[in-house]
């Protein structure tokens, strides 16, 4: 592997110890090619790792050989991009290396007057699992689609070590699979070219409603119905928004993103109709339209129970209301959902599986929730302790990526000390990945603190 930097957890070279975890930190596409060939020739358990934010544990595995792509940092703006093989151009675009994080991409776009369809966390790698898992954007998707809807071309290294271009003119089947089929499954994506949009202003506002002590359930359901109907009305106008519930104290928060405006008065007028419904509802409540830091229960067990309850009880009830309508997001899914093939891909799974067998004959790329996921069951297990150490390492990387945010320390300590937790999850068939707990804890606590150019209204009122 000349030209690649390799080491394992003991500090010894990979040529000396194959039974230990190996890491290769890549700076060139040629490094990716030789690393893949090395893993294939030595029958190593290969894992593709970018910034380590994957909540399903797909960016790590016990005893694995990890290919790190976060050093592939390059961006190039195109005034009018022409994909390879195309006879026409596709308009303004940006080519993004696999290691470019969203915060840097947004900052570069702000300097040049454009933006991309991306998520809220600035330390997530744009081209990694985020993009390949669909790429939902809370602010932009209602107007501009998912991140994958705006991909024009992908460069990737296949399981054979070949560098290929995938777009609407070359390797169309791989291009289709890489846009939503899941990261680390079909090939190692080294860069992607995506459509860009003018960097327009945006106003983000929140309407918070809390229930006074003693409010009956029926009245609270009426409040929630008003909020949800309001959200649907705004969504129909292509205004993005999210709805959050907090159990203690009982409250609900509606967040809305008004693109292409900086006029706070116009936003207030848009909200007035919804607020008037609360004023005339005769239901006791308190509301405000200011930004709030969302709080979540700190108990690890509580988070595990909530995840299991969502997958096993709440979602099946919702699906039963209309079996023909299902919407799932791979990047935020339960890694242990037994029905993941149907939940995330439905009728597309068989086509994706066929493409997996075409582009990765020997199943070199194996991940949780991925195609040929069954092969993972044949990989020797090193025990629950190794799994815990592996997933705790994900948390360590999250701490590193977020400048060792002290708010994660409590969660990390709890996960390391609650050893019986693993057996409890296994016995109930609802195994949850520690990195997901830490990541969700961090994300919920700082959800509205990163504001990439959007203003926040701050008026308050009480009834």
From Swiss-Prot:
Outcome of gene disruption: Abolishes the biosynthesis of communesins A and B and leads to the accumulation of 4-dimethylallyl tryptophan (4-DMAT).
Pathway assigned in UniProt: Alkaloid biosynthesis
Family matches, as InterPro entries: BBE (IPR012951), FAD-bd_PCMH (IPR016166), FAD-bd_PCMH-like_sf (IPR036318), FAD-bd_PCMH_sub2 (IPR016169), FAD-linked_Oxidoreductase (IPR050416), Oxid_FAD_bind_N (IPR006094)
Record-listed E.C. numbers: 1.-.-.-
Cofactor(s) listed: FAD
Keywords, sorted A to Z: FAD, Flavoprotein, Oxidoreductase
Name of a matching Pfam family: BBE
GO molecular function: FAD binding; oxidoreductase activity
Domain FAD-binding PCMH-type: 16-199
SUPFAM superfamilies noted in UniProt: FAD-binding/transporter-associated domain-like (SSF56176)
Functional note: FAD-linked oxidoreductase; part of the gene cluster that mediates the biosynthesis of communesins, a prominent class of indole alkaloids with great potential as pharmaceuticals. Communesins are biosynthesized by the coupling of tryptamine and aurantioclavine, two building blocks derived from L-tryptophan.
Alphabetical list of PANTHER family matching this protein: BINDING OXIDOREDUCTASE, PUTATIVE (AFU_ORTHOLOGUE AFUA_1G17690)-RELATED, FAD-BINDING PCMH-TYPE DOMAIN-CONTAINING PROTEIN
Record-stated family: Belongs to the oxygen-dependent FAD-linked oxidoreductase family.
Protein's recorded name: Aurantioclavine synthase cnsA
Species of the source: Penicillium expansum
